[in-house]
Structures are given as structure tokens and as C-alpha cells.
Swiss-Prot record:
May act as a scaffolding protein within caveolar membranes. Interacts directly with G-protein alpha subunits and can functionally regulate their activity. May also regulate voltage-gated potassium channels. Plays a role in the sarcolemma repair mechanism of both skeletal muscle and cardiomyocytes that permits rapid resealing of membranes disrupted by mechanical stress. Mediates the recruitment of CAVIN2 and CAVIN3 proteins to the caveolae. This is Caveolin-3. PANTHER family: CAVEOLIN, CAVEOLIN-3. The gene is CAV3. Its main location: Golgi. One of its GO terms (cellular component) is endoplasmic reticulum.
Amino acid sequence: MMAEERTDLEAQIVKDIHFKEIDLVNRDPKNINEDIVKVDFEDVIAEPVGTYSFDGVWKVSYTTFTVSKYWCYRLLSTLLGVPLALLWGFLFACISFCHIWAVVPCIKSYLIEIQCISHIYSLCIRTFCNPVFAALGQVCSNIKVMLRKEV
């Protein structure tokens, strides 16, 4: 009975991961496009004082820019959004696969192998270098330096 309940729970967790609710209002909850993609009319087109166009031209330009940007984005996202989502999903799946099945095992293997070498290296340092530097330290510890300031 316990194993059956556990598999039902695991199946529910897997289902929840793939079919979680998405927020249709806040579509950038982590603010990854806060400063990059947010481009308004005022960020692109500006008229300095003394070189103003007619007010009607300015209003129509604003409306044209805003509406064309809005509908062009909608058209491009309709045509290319799903194929690009598929492409990016595939790419990140490949990256995750390589990281899980190649990168991490290689790093772990390297760390295991280097641990053996580090013990030998440490033994060599303690055997050969430590006595030499200890002797040099003893020799140099008796050196006295006297500084005189000549006027």
C-alpha cells in the first residue's frame, strides 16, 4: 500500500513539473529583460529644444512607432515563438545532458585522480623542500641589518 501511494505521489510531482501554471500577467518574474529589451518611443526618438516637428507629426510618429512595434512583435512571436522555444528547449536539454553525463563525471574523475597525485606531491614537499627551507630560515634568522641615516 505504501509503495503504491508513493508512486502516485511521484507521478503527481512529475505531472506538476510539466504542467505548472504560468503567470500570463507578469511574464518576466525574474526581470531578466528589465534594462535590455524595454525600448519605448522616448528611448529611441527625441527632438532637442529648438528643432521640434509639428505636434501632429510627433503624435502620429509616436502612435506609428508604438503600434508597429507592438504588432511586429506579436507577428514575429506568433510565427517564430514556438519553433524558437523548441530550439532553445532542445539546446538547453543538450547542455544539461552534457553537464550531467559528461562534465560533472569528468570533474569528479579528475578530482579523484589528482587526490592521489596531491598526496605524492605533498610527501615530496615535506621530504625535500621543508628541510631545505627550514635550514635557510635558520641561516637567515641570524642576519641583522643596521640602517644609518647620513646627513
